Structures are given as C-alpha cells and as structure tokens.
C-alpha cells in the first residue's frame, strides 16, 4: 500500500490540499515565520476569521487547534495550532507538541478533510530542537493514521533541505516510505 505520509520541501502556502496547518501563536493574529507567510498569502480574510474566533473563545492555548477559512490560499481551510516554546524540555514541551499535531489531525478528520499539510511546528523562533520535533510529529501522525481513515494524505512541508532529510530518514526508519 502506498504511504499516506509524504515529505515535501517548499512553500506550504502554495499547496492545493484540503487543509494546511498554521504554526500560530496564541493570539491568532499572525506573526513571524510560517504564521506570517500564511497570513500574507491568505490575505485579510484570514485575519478577520482569526479575530472572529478570538472574540468567540479567546486566545488559543498551547497544544490546542482551531479552524478557519483559507482566504486566498489554494487550500480549503487553515487549522491554526499553537506549539510550545522550547524551555529546556522541562515544561511538558513534548506533550504539548504532540497535542498540537493530534488536535490538528482530529479537526481535519472531524471536518472530513482528506489531505493535510503540516509545517515543522515550534522549530522556528519557538526553538524546539528539530530532530526531537520531527520524531514527535512523525510518531503522532503515524499512530493516528493507523486508527483513522481520515485524513488520507498527510504532508510534512519542510522549508529547508535539512528538515526534509530529517523527516525522510525518520519515515524510512519506520518503513513508511
């Protein structure tokens, strides 16, 4: 059976998948890194949708996820999840990162989405070590898809070659590619 998990190197904002995941901050108001890139590419409709979510439920806690429209993106929707800031690994960061991936997958499944694309959550300015973050991402996604039919296709979208190699190596070790 062809693998359901894929690694791509490039710009997550260009993917025509059902839903892309935004590594958001708790304010949901946009920021740097992939968060800023997604907001810029999606246009003002995304910020308006995030403001509406925030008015309804307040900030998005670390490890949680919310879903909005995609604005001008080719994706159908955006799931915004808040990964943890790395603080030496002594503040439940591993579990919170796991929760960010898991809650994103659950939202995609609940909305019937067949394809989802993830950035490397928390590995930019939040400082989560790349190798540890990739292991958590791959394990969380792999465990989820063994028990669920949706999403059918999961993409890890890496901004650079180093992360791409890291994810490919982990998937090869698991026998998923």
Swiss-Prot record:
Amino-acid positions noted as binding substrate in the UniProt annotation, renumbered to this chain: 11-12, 25, 33-35, 122-126
UniProt-listed Enzyme Commission number(s): 3.1.1.106
Gene Ontology BP, a term: purine nucleoside metabolic process
Database matches in SUPFAM superfamilies: Macro domain-like
Record keywords: Hydrolase
InterPro entries found in the cross-reference section: Macro_dom, Macro_dom-like, O-Ac-ADP-ribose_deAcase
Any one GO molecular function term: O-acetyl-ADP-ribose deacetylase activity
The keyword Hydrolase belongs to this UniProt entry's keyword annotation: yes
UniProt-listed Gene3D superfamilies: Leucine Aminopeptidase, subunit E, domain 1
Keyword Mitochondrion listed: no
Disulfide bonds: none
Domain Macro intervals: 1-175
Active-site positions on this chain: 35
Enzyme class: hydrolase
Top-level taxonomic group: Bacteria
NCBIfam families reported for this sequence: PRK00431.1-1, PRK00431.1-6
Oligomeric form and interacting partners: Homodimer. Interacts with RNase III.
Annotated protein name in UniProt: O-acetyl-ADP-ribose deacetylase
């Amino acid at each position: 059976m062809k693998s359901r998990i894929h690694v791509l190197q490039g710009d997550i904002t260009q993917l025509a998948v059902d839903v892309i995941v935004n590594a958001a901050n708790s304010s949901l108001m946009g920021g740097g890194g992939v968060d800023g890139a997604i907001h810029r590419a999606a246009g003002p409709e995304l910020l308006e949708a995030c403001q509406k979510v925030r008015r309804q439920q307040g900030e998005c806690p670390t490890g949680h996820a919310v879903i909005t429209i995609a604005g001008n993106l080719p994706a159908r929707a955006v799931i915004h999840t808040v990964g943890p800031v790395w603080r030496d690994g002594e503040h439940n960061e591993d579990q919170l990162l796991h929760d960010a991936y898991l809650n994103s997958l659950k939202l995609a499944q609940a909305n019937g989405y067949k394809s989802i694309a993830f950035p490397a959550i928390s590995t930019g300015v939040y400082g989560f070590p790349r190798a540890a973050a990739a292991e958590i991402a791959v394990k969380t996604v792999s465990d989820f898809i063994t028990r669920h039919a949706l999403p059918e296709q999961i993409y890890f979208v890496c901004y650079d070659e180093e992360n791409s190699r890291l994810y490919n190596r982990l998937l090869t070790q698991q026998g998923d590619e």
